[in-house]
Amino acid sequence: MKAGIHPAYRPVLFHDTAADVYFLIGSTVDTDRTQVHSDGQTYPYVALDVSSASHPVYTGQQRKTTVEGRVAGFNKRFAGFQATR
């Protein structure tokens, strides 16, 4: 690789503020903030709003709608509009 053109790849401490979980991952993100990790070392720090630890798709806390529920809701909503022949 050509020297001087690639960003610095280093361990970075990501903090999911919603779940209060820390991830130590290699990244090229540029940040001026630092924080001491549980291993006692200081790492560049990035705060995240959502990660796999707090996103509903990954945690299984998402609202699931079933086909039966949608059909029942439709029938309930339009029950009074039945055509009389």
From Swiss-Prot:
Entry protein name: Large ribosomal subunit protein bL31B
Keywords: Ribonucleoprotein, Ribosomal protein
Name of encoding gene: rpmE2
SUPFAM superfamilies (alphabetical): L28p-like
Assigned protein family: Belongs to the bacterial ribosomal protein bL31 family. Type B subfamily.
Annotated InterPro entries: Ribosomal_bL28/bL31-like_sf, Ribosomal_bL31, Ribosomal_bL31_B, Ribosomal_bL31_sf
GO-annotated cellular components: ribonucleoprotein complex; ribosome
Phosphoprotein as UniProt keyword: no
PANTHER family, sorted: 50S RIBOSOMAL PROTEIN L31, CHLOROPLASTIC (PTHR33280), LARGE RIBOSOMAL SUBUNIT PROTEIN BL31C (PTHR33280:SF1)
Assembly and oligomerization: Part of the 50S ribosomal subunit.
Pfam families recorded: Ribosomal_L31
One GO MF term: structural constituent of ribosome
Domain of life: Bacteria
Single GO biological process annotation from the record: translation
